[in-house]
Structures are given as C-alpha cells and as structure tokens.
Curated annotation (Swiss-Prot):
Function: May regulate transcription elongation by RNA polymerase II. May enhance transcriptional pausing at sites proximal to the promoter, which may in turn facilitate the assembly of an elongation competent RNA polymerase II complex.
Top-level division of the source organism's lineage: Eukaryota
The protein, known as: Transcription elongation factor SPT4 homolog 2
A GO term, aspect molecular function: zinc ion binding
Source organism of this protein record: Arabidopsis thaliana (Mouse-ear cress)
One of the Pfam families matching this protein, by short name: Spt4
Subcellular location: Nucleus
Zinc finger (C4-type): 19-39
Keywords: Activator, Metal-binding, Nucleus, Repressor, Transcription, Transcription regulation, Zinc, Zinc-finger
Length: 116
C-alpha cells in the first residue's frame, strides 16, 4: 500500500464510487479494470460483483492527495499511508461483515464510518 499513485477518476459524474475501506474514489470502470490500489485483497478486477459490495456511490466530498505521508489533511483523514489519489472525506455505509472479516484475515485496519 502506498507509493504508486492510484488512478485519478476519469469523470466526476454520477459514475464515481468510493471504496468502503480506504475511501479511494474512482469510476466503476476503473475499479473493474485495476481494482483498488490500497485494497488489492478485495480482487475487484477479478470479481466484478465485488465492486458493488465494497464500493459506494454515496459519499461526501473529495480530496486529492499527492503526498499522503506529508499531508496533514491525509493524516487527519487517516489516509496518510495510502496511495496518492482522490479520496472521499466520508462514506456513510459500513463495509459488509464478510468483507470486514476479510480485512481481519488480511490484517488490515478497517474503521467503521461515523454516523452522519
């Protein structure tokens, strides 16, 4: 996780989705083609149904981060160790329990979203 930049969304319309774990924002097609740079264990590029499970079109705000490790905003949003890219400020729905268990198995942190 971290050093190679994530794909930048090719469109900023209604087709944007955010990863429910890391909050990376890309289009559905980008998740289908390359998966999530921060969450490769979801294997979205192999299982296209998983994209709908682990991403959401419902999110608030977008921040672009070029150097997450040096950005106070990235650290405040808890994305300081993720790949440079576009992230949402907040998602309003949790990752499905099955995927939360997968995160535990992979020993990666998952923080439930705050109530909005």
């Amino acid at each position: 996780m971290g050093s190679a930049p994530a794909q930048i969304p090719t469109s900023f319309g209604h087709e944007l989705r955010a990863c429910l774990r890391c909050r990376l924002v890309k289009t559905y097609d980008q998740f289908r083609d390359a998966g999530c740079e921060n969450c490769p264990f979801f294997k979205m590029e192999e299982d296209h149904e998983r994209i709908v499970e682990v991403t959401t079109p419902n999110f608030n705000g977008i921040i672009s981060v070029m150097d997450p490790s040096r950005s106070w905003a990235a650290r405040w949003l808890r994305i300081g160790k993720f790949a440079p890219g576009c992230y949402t400020l907040a998602v309003s729905e949790p990752l499905p329990e099955e995927m939360q268990h997968l995160c535990q198995e992979e020993r990666v942190q998952y923080v439930l979203p705050k109530r909005m």
